[in-house]
Structures are given as structure tokens and as C-alpha cells.
């Protein structure tokens, strides 16, 4: 039994880090909570308040008090002797200004350039939101997350893309409209988080089928499988693979290509070999272009 367990663990480790791994898969097997945002402030500047968010209102100076209010079902909070302030759909900065203006109606020391009472509004407990991760996800389904969560948070909760899922064109759908597309390679290779938007109640994160997949072996820094977008070619692939190791021959790449069914002939191999000469990291003049096909 122990031997079977060790064998299964070795196979799992190989699937995440060995030559048979898909680039990016190990990212979703980090410790739990790596991408789980806190359930209380601070929040990004573009965070918009909603029903259930908790506000902490602090005033000091000529008047001192502290209030805690939860945004109610009407999307507002009620201030003593000052009335209602609408919060839902506004940023924290906008809400702070509205609260300061409302309090100034009953506390003269808050208003004007010579105000002797300062007001600060911060966020306490954040509301939960329900989002959906569908398509080719490892664990598709509905997830309750903090309202400070982003697309990456939802992906991590769902275990990331499945073996058949794309790492390159993950879509954030709000209503019936795609509002952002996340390329995980841009994040993993260059640290770029374009498309990693804050989530809202009812958002859907959709993982489509993967694009072309190419297997890199030999003396590169990260030999494994890579998913390639339209327009990407051999230099892009070598860049994703971390470049060549010192012992590599820098001016030649061998490609083993599996032929499409329409190109196969009876009695002939189902694959061909191509030698691509490189110059300055690109196919040399007169060499095959190095177009990469799925498989």
C-alpha cells in the first residue's frame, strides 16, 4: 500500500514539475490561502462598496466619536442626527466625502477650510460575494469569496484550469458581456496582471478549451508543455521555457511534428522531423519558419 501511495505521489509530482507537466499547473498547488484576500480592509482604490460591507467612522478634534455601520439592504448607512448616506456602488473615497459632508450638517467643526474636527472612514468586515467558475476548470462550480477577490482568487479556489483548459484566454463575464481576459502566462513570466479585475456578485469566470500545446524537451530551463496563442512562434516558446541552458547548441532546434490525419499516408510514419537553424534566437534565413502546431 505504501509503495502504491509513493508511486501515485511521484506521478502527481511529475505531472506538476517534470517534463510531462503543463507550464502553470504547479501554480495552483501552492499552500491554501495564497490568493485568499483578507475579509477586512484595506481594499484597492477601485473597490466599490455593497450591501453587507462594514464601515468604521472615526472623528477626532473638537468632536470625538467612533461609529460602526453596515451597509443595509438599501445600499446606505444611517448616521445619528445626520441622516442617510448612499454607499452601494461608490468607492471608499467617495463614501468618505459623502459622510463628511453629511456629518458637517450637524457638526459645524467638520466643515470648511478651518475645520477643527477630522473625519476618517475605513472598511471593517467585507461582504461575501458569490461567483461562478465554469468551463474547463479543475473544480467548476459556485464559490463564496471575499468581495476584495479577483479573477486569480476564483481560479485558485477552483484549482485552476483542468488538463483540457486554457491558461491563456480566461474570461471574466459580467451579465452577458466579457469585460476582461486574463493571460496567466503574462503573469507567470512577466508579472503582468492585466485582466485580473475585482469580482462582483454574480460574476462568471469562464475557462475555454486550451489552444495549441507544444512539448519542449532537452537543455532548456523549463522543459514541459506550453500553450501557445495565435501569432506566437518558436522564439516565444523558447522565452516561456526560460531560454537555453549553457550546454545547449544555440543555433539549432529539432522539431518532431505529429502529422494531421489528412497528411498521413498508408505505411508511412505519423510524424516528421524538422531542423530549424537559429540566428539571434530566430529562424535563420532559408530555414523553415518554425511554425508551431498543436501536438
Which residue stretches match the model-derived regions?
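Ser/Thr/Pro/Gly-biased, low-complexity, turn-/loop-rich segments
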Residues: 1-295
